[in-house]
């Protein structure tokens, strides 16, 4: 009876995620960033990180202020949406009689809550190297105070690696060669048969994802030609081949996999 109620409430319970996705991916518009020489640069989810990698600190700060000032205008909307999401998770956990929402989230993954907490504790205990890195970055950049918009720019000037998508695919194939020709054949199939939505577009969500559809997986990218974009291509294709092999070789009941296995 309880599961029938939860199933009936499923679409309603998904509303917080739907609302935030529409706000973030479709409705938010950001002012142009202005460089030190006065040139204007459009700010979108896709252009933000490349702007953060500019050696022009004026441009970086302008892009940062552009993005976060708009998010700040909707902070109450975002807070209410997050609150609704938390209430949804708490509702499901209580109805299913879990001790906590953490227990509910980890159920089915075979990952004990102790592992989750130990991971966080280990990160907290290991902040020292990160603090030293931040101090080194501040010194190398020659700034008195390090800001969020100083964290992406290369600390060595004159190093700019840009790749076309065709070059990124070639790098991916070379990197994955040790996994064998059968694996490479699937990668090529994905490259040649439109599995990938490559570039940023208006209304397209930010980030990168792989969706393991039945016909074949689909990959969402927002490719800008950076080295990180090349890494992301390889990473997401890994998810896609995982899904493809699982879907073609496992019974339906066993095709899905948990996030801990995927990553």
Kindly give the residue locations of the regions a language model identified.
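A glycine-rich phosphate-binding loop feature that marks nucleotide/adenosyl-phosphate handling sites
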Residues: 32-37, 91, 137-155, 189-198, ...
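Long, K/E/R/D-enriched contiguous segments that form extended
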Residues: 136-188, 192, 242
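Catalytic zinc-binding patch centered on the HExxH motif and its immediate surroundings
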Residues: 158-163, 196-216
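Short pre-active-site segment immediately N-terminal to the catalytic Zn-binding motif
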Residues: 159-165, 171, 178, 213-234, ...
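Catalytic glutamate of the conserved HExxH
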Residues: 232-236, 240, 244
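Post-HEXXH active-site segment of zinc metalloproteases
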Residues: 243-263
């Amino acid at each position: 009876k309880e599961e029938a109620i939860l199933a009936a409430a499923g679409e309603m319970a998904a509303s917080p995620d739907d609302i935030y996705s529409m706000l973030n991916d479709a409705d938010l518009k950001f002012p142009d960033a202005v460089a030190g020489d006065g040139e204007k640069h459009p700010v979108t989810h896709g252009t933000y990180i490349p702007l953060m990698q500019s050696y022009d600190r004026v441009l970086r700060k302008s892009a940062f202020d552009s993005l976060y000032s708009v998010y700040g205008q909707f902070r109450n909307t975002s807070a209410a949406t997050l609150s609704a999401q938390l209430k949804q998770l708490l509702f499901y956990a209580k109805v299913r009689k879990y001790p906590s929402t953490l227990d509910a989230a980890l159920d089915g993954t075979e990952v004990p809550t102790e592992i989750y907490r130990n991971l966080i504790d280990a990160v907290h205990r290991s902040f020292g190297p990160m603090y030293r890195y931040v101090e080194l970055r501040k010194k190398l950049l020659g700034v008195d105070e390090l800001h969020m918009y100083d964290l992406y720019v290369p600390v060595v000037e004159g190093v700019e690696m840009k790749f076309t998508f065709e070059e990124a695919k070639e790098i991916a194939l070379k990197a994955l060669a040790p996994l064998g020709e059968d694996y490479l054949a699937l990668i090529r199939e994905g490259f040649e048969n439109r599995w990938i939505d490559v570039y940023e577009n208006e209304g397209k969500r930010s980030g990168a994802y792989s969706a393991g559809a039945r016909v074949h997986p689909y990959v969402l990218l927002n490719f800008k030609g950076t080295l990180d974009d090349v890494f992301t291509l390889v990473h997401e294709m890994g998810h896609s081949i995982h899904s493809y092999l699982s879907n073609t070789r496992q019974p339906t009941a066993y095709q899905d996999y948990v996030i801990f296995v995927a990553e």
